[in-house]
């Protein structure tokens, strides 16, 4: 533990010595600007203005005006963006002899084609220019669907589906293109700090009021992120201090007229007048009572009491350098089962966890030569202290404790070249080291698991920009301590972009999954009155993948309407695919074993479409058609000495999708209709409540939601919004739930909540 902190401390000590060649800043150098709407010439307030070369940013005031002061003389590129408008970029020359004045006229854009993302190449780039398809879930989406946490948001990203895998504790998991959770990598500000343990309930422990946006890359895509991201990458970008502001909100929710939930959130952002330092703070409180859908006395949605707090701060020693710090803490208690007024060991079933999570990070960015060269040094750490009870039939020995420490450190370099072989190019390279130390003890299950995962990585990529073509070639070398030989993972992306309205992409990537414990291994499912554990088979080999994808992206406008259609095809081939087989009782414990199968293929198509008429009305929908099949039928259980097999991957529908429809029929009134569709799938149903194990085929589900909000302008530009609505209006919910203490808690599928009513208040400045 001490070595880790010494290493991070050493990185921090290097920071002050890395910008000794920074140019001297002279007083009086200034940019003064004005942002207006192109069609009406009305002022645009709260537009974001960024100096591309330095990363320094500000926001326009109520009159659309902005300033930058104390700048070093030279040429700068300003990029202006605002919600609902196309991004505009202009160059300006700063001199000590005069104030540079610049004006921006922004055109309406309600389909976000100019949105800036970082997950494609770790460098800021417009979404339509990115070499891979990047989908974005923004704060606007969170409000449209009234999502309290990340788990409730990801269903509204094409190709993603969030499911609840436990009837007791509510273990959520996100699938990308049909591949289960461990195939995907969840990042916080591009850092792989989410461990297997934090992945068990992590999607519900991240409140949306800490999130600026979520960027999703389906498939391997970029070599800069882990090669274990076979399914894709979910990159959570937290809120950064940009301007002085605050917000506070509260929301009351009722589940099917039976159970209540309360959410309270607050955000504060403070920035110095010269924009050289700032801090953004968030806090969230959530309290949910257990919900029993079928009246058997056992919960379908568990009790949650959650407190989160965090901050992100920065300091700019010079205009071309930035030091960033962040800290997050979570204190959560969740419990599912029955007899909530008694101790867990006095209940028939209880799955209970108490988490204390502390994480933090530091990063130092330095640019030079007009910011055409940049180096970033970073380190992040997370510690989890979990106490748990996964037991049934009043078992006094089902208590457990888990200690989990994850840390990552590294450095990246990015350089722009006027010519590399045959065209201008951007090179990115770096090194990264991450370690996870896990100790999980449950006496009643004879479990004392220690796992130490160490991964050293080096990566590089080069992107050639040939005007209408862009070619990105990259590779990553990973040395995993649980795998004998280093793993080389190449990635290739080709982008054809004849104009801003049409892009076509081709991608090839490889990846792997190591033979280690994943999130579901650290969760004990209650089946038939006893806990079921997962163990790794002897000689388990790493899983390898080869992925291909291609897409076409077309944007058009007609009159005041804008439209965008994205069609994407994907194919992933898995070798030594991991499968779970129920092997019965071993040493008085029910065991499922993770083994290597022959292989699998996952292929299909995603459709993403948007159409908008200004801010009056906007429709967005996503739909996925896919197949997830093993190459040969794999055994999943044995009943009466007969092996039950399946060639179809479990819990993966062939068809699923979503839609959102938003409208502002009158000023200050916002209406939203949204929904998700989940097609039929197969789900294993284990004996306990039923006599023998069997495979079930689920029905189709359609979840429909409605929300209305009205905003009042109070004193001094303070806004008050009142909102209310209904989620899952049709009460589309699983109808064949197991009941009682012998139920299979893993037999849980479909929408994650019943018909739900909510009302909320939000105050912002």
Annotate each language-model stretch with its function.
Residues 36-40, 47-52, 81-85, 95-143, ...:
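Short, acidic, small-residue-rich periplasmic hinge/interaction motif at the N-terminus
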Residues 575, 677-686, 710-765:
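C-terminal beta-signal and adjacent terminal beta-strands/loops
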Residues 195-197, 210-212, 223-235, 239-295, ...:
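Outer-membrane beta-barrel translocator/receptor signature
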Residues 288-308, 314-375, 381-404:
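Flexible loop and strand-edge segments within Gram-negative outer membrane beta-barrel domains
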Residues 465-470, 570-573, 593-686, 762:
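Gram-negative outer-membrane beta-barrel transporters
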Residues 69, 173-175, 191-218, 239:
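Short acidic/polar hinge/loop motifs at secondary-structure boundaries
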Residues 151-192, 212:
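Extracytoplasmic beta-strand/coil segments of soluble accessory domains associated
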Residues 266-268, 376-390, 505, 539-595, ...:
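Membrane-embedded beta-barrel scaffold of Gram-negative outer-membrane proteins
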